[in-house]
Amino acid sequence: MTATLERRSSQGLWDRFADWVTSTNNRFYVGWFGVLMIPTLLSATICFVVAFVAAPPVDMDGIREPISGSLLYGNNIITGAVIPSSNAIGLHFYPIWEAASMDEWLYNGGPYQLVVFHFLIGVFCYLGREWELSYRLGLRPWICIAYSAPVAAAAAVFLIYPIGQGSFSDGMPLGISGTFNFMFVFQAEHNILNHPFHMLGVAGVFGGSLFSAMHGSLVTSSLIRETSMEESQNYGYKFGQEEETYNIIAAHGYFGRLIFQYASFNNSRSLHFFLAAWPVIGIWFTALGISVMAFNLNGFNFNSSIVDSQGRAIYTWADIVNRANLGMEVMHERNAHNFPLDLAGTESAPVAVGNADLNG
């Protein structure tokens, strides 16, 4: 008998690290994208929490009137936010080392850029990590394609819109009330409710919710019972089983009779592709709408679009919306602008009919 002994090739530190990063046997898959994702998302999260709790007021409008957004400066969970960086900074990259002091960096809203940039890099890497794990497991790439919709939406409001408007002070504040303020101002300045891409986005989000509820309720209503009446039907499912867990024929027949025959899918794969594609395409259009409105390609404007035989305007709901837009625009940055651009751009009307006699 002959025994052959081979010396085990010793792996270097880098090789062991690479094997650990790309191993699909780990409880948590890291991946090469994860090597960048983990530190960036941790940095964004830590900075967001600290800024939300303790950041001093920020001169967002660049007019020396700071706005407080942290909890320690009088806000609560609803009104608190990480305030966008100052309009005086504009689109300049503003890391800590660009400021003369930490106080100046905080006053000009430096934490906002730190959070947003690290967050965007992190979610981009999360998307890449989804693709990477799918590739290593032999899956198709639809998971990361679906996730690209919220990533595109985040990039639109945090990056593309500020670039189009010329300042990161126009980005969405990182808070609940700040988000609503961003929405109101966006409507006032761009009439987003009358933009077709926003309409497609609304159809995608609400339609996706409706289809998800319909699908879940149909499946739950047509489960194949594998248990006794005393046990929950959920116990009849075994993870990895080959048999169908619900009767798609019964669900198809029910829904086809409830609406009409061709409103129901008889192919499970087509059905689930539709459930994924509908909201994803809708959110893609929303992100595209934000991106084009960033460069002032705004929603439709129906100002006084209906007139009578005498040429007088017949006001419609569109005119009511336009008036609401003007009101919101007046309230926005009230100390920086006395009137919205729609009014300030017209010729000035004289205050008095004639010159006042100063000599009395």
Curated annotation (Swiss-Prot):
InterPro entries: D1/D2, Photo_II_D1/D2_sf, Photo_RC_L/M, Photo_RC_L/M_CS, PSII_D1. A quinone binds at H215, S264, F265. It is a multi-pass membrane protein. GO terms for biological process: photosynthetic electron transport in photosystem II; response to herbicide. GO terms for cellular component: photosystem II; plasma membrane. Fe cation binds at H215, H272. SUPFAM superfamilies: Bacterial photosystem II reaction centre, L and M subunits. Its EC number is 1.10.3.9. The keyword Electron transport applies. The chain crosses the membrane at residues 29-46, 118-133, 142-156, 197-218, 274-288. Pheophytin a binds at Y126. Belongs to the reaction center PufL/M/PsbA/D family. Cyanobacteria usually contain more than 2 copies of the psbA gene. HAMAP family: PSII_PsbA_D1. This is Photosystem II protein D1 1. The gene is psbA1.
